[in-house]
Amino acid sequence: FSLNSGQTLFVPGGVIENKPIIQTQFIAQIQAGVRGSSNFIWPTSGGITQYPVVYHMALDIANPSSPPVLAADSGTVVYAGCLNWGYGCNVIIDHGNGYQSLYAHLSSYSVEAGNSVGQGSQIGVMGSTGRSTGMHLHFEIRSGGVLLNPLSFLK
């Protein structure tokens, strides 16, 4: 008898254990609309579940109540759409000062490319679209195509 990789094994009378549900661990709580040391404000309310690191230069902010997502600063929407992978439904705002902000995994968005948005205006709703592990906002700040640490702008 041999068992090959990928082969399904059926055990009569066997029981499949349910996978444990792992609660999201909030590293820190933040409040939408609170201004950081630069012009950017926090884009939503919730708990930080992932800080920026070399392989993930973004903030992940989770909140099971699916709160609104706000423009971190004024600017022009350069992209608003949905992908079946990666960022899922997302919005990119060009702030006209060399910076862009990206808001990903939205359940819905309320802006279109070309729209002008004011700081703090609602651009969407937190979701779990694309390649996502649960309800959260993936928030990036970019300059010249380079991802920057959002905390440098929000602290």
Residue positions per predicted region:
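Conserved positions in beta-strands of structured domains
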Residues: 49, 76-78, 107, 124-127
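Zn2+-dependent peptidoglycan hydrolase active-site motif and core
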Residues: 72-110, 135-140
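Active-site-proximal beta-strands of protease catalytic cores
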Residues: 75, 114-129
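Short, low-complexity, Pro/Ser/Thr/Gly-rich segments in the mature regions of secreted, periplasmic
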Residues: 143-155
